[in-house]
């Protein structure tokens, strides 16, 4: 069964969503982060909660550590955190604060040796986040090009004990227009590492289709704030 990971994106300790990762598209969510955690925690089908420090991702260092630490105390669900994680000490601080998993993106792309070291140091607890327009990988809060190809890069990671690869199709993110099923399916076939789909998920039918592609988990953003998404789920 595909896992469900609702998302909380933070700017200034406020729960927001962006469209296509553009910071000028910031939209405040109807529920606070605290309210969202309480809401998601009632569902047995929620395996973990995905939290992103958006300003940290852009500024290249974590900004919301203390606030995220306070959120950790509000639920028994697993929590993973990403955004601005660039050092081993940051990862260790999050783990010491009770965070279960850390997400590495830009730093892992720019320094694959470091990514390998972190994955071997914390096997199964480091997730690699790859964000792309089509097959073109972006970094630093999705604002910079890398000239790297999604599939070529991911194939380099096959022997690393990562928890998974979080794939965000940027053009779909925040639009509620459905995931990029074609590229997501191709990515699943290109690696033995579990693939987590993010971006564009609208409803349970999207989840079912991702499950048919052998996607390990789905990160749900805007849709998770709609009661209709959760109808019939426990």
From Swiss-Prot:
Q: Does the keyword Glycoprotein apply?
A: no
Q: Name one GO biological process term.
A: L-histidine biosynthetic process
Q: Cross-referenced Gene3D superfamilies, in alphabetical order?
A: Aldolase class I (3.20.20.70)
Q: CDD domains, alphabetically?
A: HisA (cd04732)
One Pfam family, short name: His_biosynth
Q: Which GO terms describe its molecular function?
A: 1-(5-phosphoribosyl)-5-[(5-phosphoribosylamino)methylideneamino]imidazole-4-carboxamide isomerase activity
Sequence similarity: Belongs to the HisA/HisF family.
Its recorded name reads 1-(5-phosphoribosyl)-5-[(5-phosphoribosylamino)methylideneamino] imidazole-4-carboxamide isomerase
């Amino acid at each position: 069964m595909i896992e469900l990971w609702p998302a909380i994106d933070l700017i200034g300790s406020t729960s927001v969503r962006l469209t296509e990762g553009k910071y000028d598209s910031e939209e405040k969510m109807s529920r606070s982060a605290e309210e969202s955690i309480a809401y998601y925690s009632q569902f047995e089908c929620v395996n973990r909660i995905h939290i992103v420090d958006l300003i940290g991702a852009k500024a290249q260092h974590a900004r919301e550590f203390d606030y995220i630490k306070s959120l950790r105390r509000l639920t028994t669900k697993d929590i993973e955190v990403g955004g601005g994680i660039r050092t081993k000490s940051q990862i260790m601080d999050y783990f010491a604060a009770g965070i279960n998993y850390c997400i590495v993106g830009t730093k892992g792309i720019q320094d694959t040796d470091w990514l390998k070291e972190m994955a071997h140091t914390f096997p199964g607890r480091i997730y690699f986040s790859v964000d792309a327009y089509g097959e073109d990988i972006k970094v630093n809060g999705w604002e910079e090009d890398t000239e790297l190809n999604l599939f070529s890069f991911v194939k380099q990671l096959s022997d690393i004990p990562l928890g998974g690869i979080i794939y965000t199709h940027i053009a779909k993110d925040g639009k509620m227009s459905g995931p990029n099923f074609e590229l997501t399916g191709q990515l699943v076939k290109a690696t033995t590492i579990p693939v987590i789909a993010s971006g564009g998920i609208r409803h349970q039918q999207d989840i079912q289709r991702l499950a048919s592609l052998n996607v390990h988990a789905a990160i749900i953003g805007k849709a998770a704030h709609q009661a209709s998404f959760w109808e019939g789920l426990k």
